[in-house]
Amino acid sequence: MRRYLPLLGEAARRYRRPVGARWRVDETYCRLNGRWAHCYRAIDQDGQVVDVYVSERRTAAAARALFERAIAETGVRPERVVTDEARCYPPALRAPVPNAEHRTSKYLNNGLERDHGHLKQRLRPMRGFKQCASADGFSRGHALVQNLRNGLSSLTDRVPRSLRLATVWPQLARAI
C-alpha cells in the first residue's frame, strides 16, 4: 500500500479538478499505536478533499503543516478558511495564508463533519495503525478514492457513479 498509493496519487493529480479558494478544515481522531492521534482534513467548497495530515499532537505546528503541504501540492492559497473554534488554527494560518479570511463556526463545518464519517467507517474495522506514516498514507489514499468516487476528476465527471472506480483504476494503473 505504501508503495503504490503515492504512485496512484501522482498519476491522478494531473486529472484532478482545480481546487477551490474556500476551504473547510477540521480534525478527527484515529488510533495510532494504541493511542488517539489527530487526522487533519481540508476540503474545498465543492467537497473535494484538498489534503489530509495525521499528527500525534493537536498543535498549531501540525495545522500549519497541513496548510503548507496543501498549498504546495495544489498551488492554491485559500481566500477563506472555515474552522471550528480550536485555538491551534489562528496561529497556523498566519504564516502560510496571512490574507485569508478566517471564520470560526461549528455549524459552517457540518459538511466536513459529515465527511469524517466516511473515513471513520473505513477505519473502524482496521482498529488503528502502528505508525504515523501508515495512517497518513492510508488517509491520503482514502481521500484519492473519495474524490474519484464523487466525480471530482476529469476522468470520472461523465461516468455514472456506480462505474467510476471500475473505469478509472485501469487508466491509473497504466499511468504507473
Annotated model-derived regions:
Residues 78-89, 93, 106:
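Acidic/histidine-rich, metal-coordinating catalytic segments
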Residues 105-124, 135:
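RNase H-like two-metal-ion nuclease catalytic core shared by retroviral integrases
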Residues 33-49, 59, 67:
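Short conserved beta-strand segments at catalytic cores or DNA/RNA-binding microdomains
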Residues 125, 134-176:
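C-terminal domain-tail junction helix/linker
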